Amino acid sequence: TGADELTAAYSALFYSLPIINTILMPLAMAILASRLWDVEVKGCTPKLLYTLQSRRSLFAAKAALGLAEIFLIVMLEAAGSLLIGHLQHYTQPYPAAGQAAYLWGCTFAVDCMIFFSELLLTVLLANPLPALCVGILGTLLGLFSAFMPAWVGYFVPWGYFIPLNTYRIADWDQASKVVTYMIVPFQWPLLVATVVLAGILFFAAWY
């Protein structure tokens, strides 16, 4: 019933959000990276800027701006989840502070990792098109991995939102259409690997 669904509404929402992020964020991060660097590519303005500042300082400024925008995106997503719960009158309590911090921290980490991979492509190739193509491909691969065995997702970085998620389906009653959710432990090794990969991609573009 509708009342029963509201008692597990946040579980359903947080189960679905990583899938939505897998669809939207690879392309969104590609657009963000390409637009940040494309501003300087057009007209060869980097050659002028390099007379005033170092290449690394210019890249650091672009990366910092990108991280700030990603943080804003994640905060808006977090606020949106609260707003949805309020407007739809969810009866299930919002996830505990530690659980919510982990979920949004994972979202931020994966976004940053994808962003730095796209920024690296844009800087190396001086062309935003390859980054956009990789973003589209990443969306398709990430979504495809969601319907494959769990181990496949570990080889698809664009879809790390899903294996990092702690909300899983425990049971689905086909007759009543009732879904039961469960919470699994935090995926710390994968989160650490995501942060390390983001750092490697950043320094690869930095140097």
Protein language model features and the residues they cover:
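Secretory targeting signals
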Residues: 1-29, 33, 60-125, 143, ...
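Helix-loop-helix units of permease transmembrane domains in multi-pass membrane transporters
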Residues: 34-68
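Alpha-helical transmembrane segments and their helix-entry boundary regions
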Residues: 58, 130-132
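Tryptophan-centric aromatic hotspots in well-structured domains and transmembrane helices
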Residues: 45-46, 120, 158-160
